[in-house]
């Protein structure tokens, strides 16, 4: 056998091996060749799932008419808007469903195959909400709509760090997410204001950056000049958990129903540990009007409680679907407004079970002549609202 013949045989063998490896690799990727979801020109969205053995396939998503579920929490009846469901139609083993035209937004969904929850194998984009995983997609119908702010745009980008810090108050190390705006590394003489952004019950330090799209929102608002360049600190507000599942020292199942996580006292007492760490390790402003605190649901209550315990700590307070109801003669709330916050902002959805307490706080503040701002949106206790509230709140602070 000549050298040239041997060289050709080796080349052919290598090509065959490469092709086989590529085929095997593609076979390991579920849903290869199927596009799902597909955003159509008319702003409808088509979902596809191939399974010739399935009897029924349904989709559950927050783009469908919601199911209203009533439950009792803290002795109050509340309404949860659960995602609606729809049936996929099968043809030759391929199941499909197309939505009505949708508005710009971030949407979540899951599939149910013969009653069993299944992730869409053709969609690699997923989010975890407490202990529940869903597929997600974003869509924007025009620049400046909600979906546009939630997507990565061609603008200067900030950086995101997962930071461990010592909490002497709680006697442990804890983890938080820190966003620094574009230019932070270059503007070495500038000190930045800080927004402390708190998650809800069952959440963790990843919630606002993942589900809340806080990073994309801040990048895009700052690039447009609609928000001041700021650092955003997203701590873990469940005091007995070090960090999110998978990065803490213990294995645990996050849950929204754990009553221990609803306590605000431990967070109030240990929060100065976070501020001291930020002021020692980042270039931040150290005055009242260089700090803001805001949060959703439990994080809203924690924000309200923090402003009561430390009235002069924050110049801006935001409560998204979560407040501390006022007492008859609320001296702690009186101290908050005596410290002259520039913004005391309450936001809630019309069908949110927390609306009752939100209105009570609003009306109490108004009866005392306290300068309170109130924002009412459609919908209930859902991430769609909390992303919107952050987008609005971020444009109001540090100005």
Across the structure, where does each feature detected by a protein language model lie?
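Bacterial Sec-dependent N-terminal signal peptides
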Residues: 1-27
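Feature targets compositionally biased, intrinsically disordered low-complexity regions
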Residues: 18, 30-32, 92, 236
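N-terminal edge beta-strand
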Residues: 25-46
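Non-catalytic cap/lid and distal C-terminal segments of serine-dependent acyl enzymes
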Residues: 39-399
